[in-house]
Amino acid sequence: MASVYENSYMIVLIFLLLGILLPVVALTLGRMLRPNKPSAAKATTYESGIEPFHDANIRFHARYYIFALLFVIFDVETLFLYPWAVAYDKLGLFALIEMLIFVVMLLVGLAYAWKKKVLQWL
């Protein structure tokens, strides 16, 4: 019986090693085989075929990052809600209560952000 489990873990280990080794080997071979002729034209920023007319490093206001984090949080919520909604009829009442607790926790966080006026644009 133990050999079945060992065999399963061996398959996972092989896939993990292949998943790490294949990209590393491909990138290493590409770096070794490609021609290396650096020039000033290759080092410039490409902007729609014309020379860039200002610096590419633009500072964004910190509020953009807060909105991005809130978006990621609710995007991950969607990732959790979709499989639950697909398998809802098989999961039962316990899964419904768990998902309601999860959604309520996110809504409490959203209400807190709203109260602290994080959602106001500049």
UniProtKB/Swiss-Prot annotation:
Annotated membrane topology is: Multi-pass membrane protein
Question: Does the keyword Heme feature in the UniProt annotation?
Answer: no
Membrane-crossing segments per the record: 10-30, 66-86, 91-111
Question: Where is this gene product found?
Answer: Cell membrane
Which ranges of the sequence are coiled-coil? none
> Which reactions fall under this protein's catalytic activity?
a quinone + NADH + 5 H(+)(in) = a quinol + NAD(+) + 4 H(+)(out)
Q: What is its EC number?
A: 7.1.1.-
Pfam families to which the protein is assigned, alphabetical = Oxidored_q4
> What InterPro entries does the database record attribute to this sequence?
NAD(P)H_OxRDtase_bac/plastid, NADH_UbQ/plastoQ_OxRdtase_su3, NDAH_ubi_oxred_su3_sf
Source taxon at top rank: Bacteria
Give the record's keywords alphabetically. Answer: Cell membrane, Membrane, NAD, Quinone, Translocase, Transmembrane, Transmembrane helix, Transport
CC per GO annotation: NADH dehydrogenase complex; plasma membrane
Does the keyword field hold NAD?
yes
| GO MF entries | NADH dehydrogenase (ubiquinone) activity; NADH:ubiquinone reductase (non-electrogenic) activity; quinone binding
Family listed:
Belongs to the complex I subunit 3 family.
Function according to Swiss-Prot or TrEMBL: NDH-1 shuttles electrons from NADH, via FMN and iron-sulfur (Fe-S) centers, to quinones in the respiratory chain. The immediate electron acceptor for the enzyme in this species is believed to be a menaquinone. Couples the redox reaction to proton translocation (for every two electrons transferred, four hydrogen ions are translocated across the cytoplasmic membrane), and thus conserves the redox energy in a proton gradient.
* Subunit architecture: NDH-1 is composed of 14 different subunits. Subunits NuoA, H, J, K, L, M, N constitute the membrane sector of the complex.
What is the protein's given name?
Answer: NADH-quinone oxidoreductase subunit A
> What organism is the protein native to?
Bacillus cereus (strain ATCC 14579 / DSM 31 / CCUG 7414 / JCM 2152 / NBRC 15305 / NCIMB 9373 / NCTC 2599 / NRRL B-3711)
